[in-house]
Amino acid sequence: MNLGPTEILLILVIVVLLFGAKKLPDAARSLGRSMRIFKSEVKEMSNDDQRYEEQQQQRQIAAQAQQQVVNPVEIPQPQPTDIQRPQQ
């Protein structure tokens, strides 16, 4: 979409007619605030995504670590032995 100088001038004239010369600075200020809020929300959403991915990775690491835990060594219990009784 290529806008030439005449198209840009026409758009500016329409904007001035719609908002009026007095309200134009307020409208620009409001637009700037809205853009700033939008950018901060987008940045926060990407940070939330990164935190979620980090949590998922930590959960996977924890699950792998739990699978690798070795059962404690079991000490064999002494088995009863056959004792021969003396014959009488």
Curated annotation (Swiss-Prot):
Biased composition of type Basic and acidic residues is found at 46-56
Keyword Cell membrane part of the UniProt annotation: yes
What's this protein's family per the entry?
A: Belongs to the TatA/E family.
Question: Chief location of this protein?
Answer: membrane
Record text on subunit structure and interactions: The Tat system comprises two distinct complexes: a TatABC complex, containing multiple copies of TatA, TatB and TatC subunits, and a separate TatA complex, containing only TatA subunits. Substrates initially bind to the TatABC complex, which probably triggers association of the separate TatA complex to form the active translocon.
MF terms (GO), sorted A to Z: protein transmembrane transporter activity
| Alphabetical list of PANTHER family matching this protein | SEC-INDEPENDENT PROTEIN TRANSLOCASE PROTEIN TATA
Q: Where is the composition biased (Low complexity)?
A: 57-68
Superkingdom of the organism of origin: Bacteria
Task: Using the UniProt annotation, give all residue ranges assigned to the region (Disordered).
Answer: 46-88
One biological process term from GO is: protein transport by the Tat complex
Q: How does it sit in the membrane?
A: Single-pass membrane protein
Q: Which UniProt keywords apply?
A: Cell membrane, Membrane, Protein transport, Translocation, Transmembrane, Transmembrane helix, Transport
Q: Which GO terms describe its cellular component?
A: TAT protein transport complex
Protein role: Part of the twin-arginine translocation (Tat) system that transports large folded proteins containing a characteristic twin-arginine motif in their signal peptide across membranes. TatA could form the protein-conducting channel of the Tat system.
Membrane-crossing segments per the record: 1-21
Name-wise, this protein is Sec-independent protein translocase protein TatA
Where, subcellularly, is it found? Answer: Cell membrane
Q: Which HAMAP family does its entry note?
A: TatA_E
